[in-house]
Amino acid sequence: MKKLLLMLVACMATMTAFAGDEGEGWSKGFTPVADKADLAGIHTVVAADGSVFASSTYNQAFQFAGKAVTDPDGLLSSCVLKYDAQGNELWAVSLVGKCKIYAMAADTDGTLYIAGQSQDEKVVITDTQGHEKEIQNPKRLSPFFEEFVSANEGFFAKIDKNGVLQSIVTLIPEVNPDILAIVGDPYEMGMEGSIYDYSFNDPVYVLPRKIVLDGDKVYVAAGFTGDIAELGWKGCYLNYFGMNESIFDIKSFGLFSMDKNLLNLASIATVQATEKVQTMSQYYPETIDFVVYDGVPHVAFIGGGELTLTTAAGSKNFAFEVTDDGLNHALVLANVNAPEQPKVFNAAPVDYLGAKFNLVDATLADGNCIMAGTFYGNFPLDNTVTKDKNVSFVASIKMSDCSVNWAKANEVESEAQCMIVTGEEIHAATADAHYVFRTSDGDLKKAENQGFNDASCYNDQYCSTIFTQENSVVVFSPKMKPSGIDETTALKNGATKYYNVNGVELSAPQKGLNIIKTADGVKKVTVK
């Protein structure tokens, strides 16, 4: 308890980075595991009323909101906790069974959407009314080990503001027996240069990365291997050394949508190796992210070799240089309605097994896409910058023409964890540091030695962050400055600015509620 109290004191000291000199807000902690190595799935999201959701793995019983969270019987399970805007504990929902939550999003009415992965034959969700729902994860025969193992399926759940489970859907990856003989990780077989990120005895997977609510749709980005029947996605199998049968499946990424009842799933885009690869050359996408701009998804991905972006509007092939010096890890931005007109940011080839390429978030602000991630070697967004270590970055890209407004790379070895934009500030975090940039020009305003696992904000009014310390999880919500819309400076030409109900700027009014601010500062709400 003493250790947790010290954490909360340190946490309060960092709040000034969000709230100015006042440092007001609240901070709470809980201890869900006995060993810090078991902490995972650490995420947070803040709702329109300022209430805060937090997720974590857990393997020991603990109290929350005056009740015991369902005993996981030692299983590394997951839980979702809710606090009100003042930090009071409200409720907990448990997911008992080996699983992990990877992303969360909250609707304006307080409804919570979670995206995770089940790694167990069965995961039981227990809501606040005691209702139980099982996530079934069927076992399959692993040809190499001749035993049955569970696939790592993706699951998506809708929980109302009172913690009552509304609906759930799963995506179960299938092994194509006519193509795939063995699935696994070459590292487990002593092969270097692995391009696979799952264990040798895990056949296939769906790994959610991001979930976004826009209008009446839920958008999800995910990594996958194998075939996903519900979306029509196919694995991109490796014909290793020209053998007649594939023995590995190269990771792919996709974006799909569903309605808010988690029905009517539809594929939007996939990024995969162009053809069945016959060598261990690194032809694969590394990561994916997206934004929804004027109701249209725009994807961003990093990858190398021969890749194909496929959407309902068509497809686009890419060929990124592979040389003796390594691989050109390019960053690509594309409108899913016009995949044939992407913006490609190339980089000089780099050859380093430990290179990290990742996008942790992309969001819209003032007509720009603000993104954060990690790279190694030559910086795709600024080729004058080259690093001999993995470093985090933050960048601003103009949506109208995909030109780079500015791009900043870290000076120290680091990996990006999360990012949020609050008005004229970008808060980007690594595991052990928090950086504050000015949105307009990327100027570094402040840096603190306290990293975050995740962060969330709503309309510049509410914010939540979450991080770990030893085997505990800390959630804090600083008191924010006035709404970014209230503080917005009118464009010099006197143009009217449009926002959706979440405070995201639009190029024009969209269907539904719109907030309009005129040059003289007058705001009004209209329905289109």
What are these regions (language model features)?
Residues 1-4, 528:
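Positively charged n-region of N-terminal signal peptides that target proteins for export
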Residues 20-482:
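A sequence-level/structural motif corresponding to short, flexible coil/turn segments enriched
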Residues 511-513:
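Extracellular Ig-like/FN3 beta-sandwich strand-entry sites
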